[in-house]
């Protein structure tokens, strides 16, 4: 059985676009009882102007599941490979925040932090 290749830190030969923004950490409580959010997803909302640019760059390209767009994200000293997803409740994309990153960078719910993302096409 062959081992799966690890996704590299950069996607060679792909077009890239970098953005910086400030956003609050939001809790996605869908499917959880009110007041019980242990294990609930946390996201940073990409501002509308940047989301509009990402959407325009995606026009005419094949869509991935849920409309996801490959990205490399950075907050503080931490960087990780992820995807940003369109939020159907607003005209923005959302950036998922891994538990490990939240603990390493002390990202608390409702607080605002500075993020950087590099979108890959």
Where are these regions (language model features)?
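Long, compositionally biased stretches
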Residues: 2-91, 116
């Amino acid at each position: 059985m062959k081992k799966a290749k690890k996704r590299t830190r950069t996607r060679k030969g792909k077009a890239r676009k970098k953005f910086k923004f400030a956003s609050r950490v939001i809790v996605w409580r869908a499917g959880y009882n009110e007041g019980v959010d242990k294990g609930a997803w946390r996201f940073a909302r990409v501002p509308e102007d940047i989301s509009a640019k990402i959407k325009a760059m995606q026009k005419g390209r094949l869509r991935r599941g849920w409309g996801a767009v490959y990205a490399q994200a950075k907050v503080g000293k931490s960087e990780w490979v992820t995807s940003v997803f369109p939020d159907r409740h607003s005209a923005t994309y959302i950036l998922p925040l891994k538990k490990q990153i939240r603990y390493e960078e002390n990202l608390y719910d409702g607080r605002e932090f500075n993020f950087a993302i590099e979108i890959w096409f």
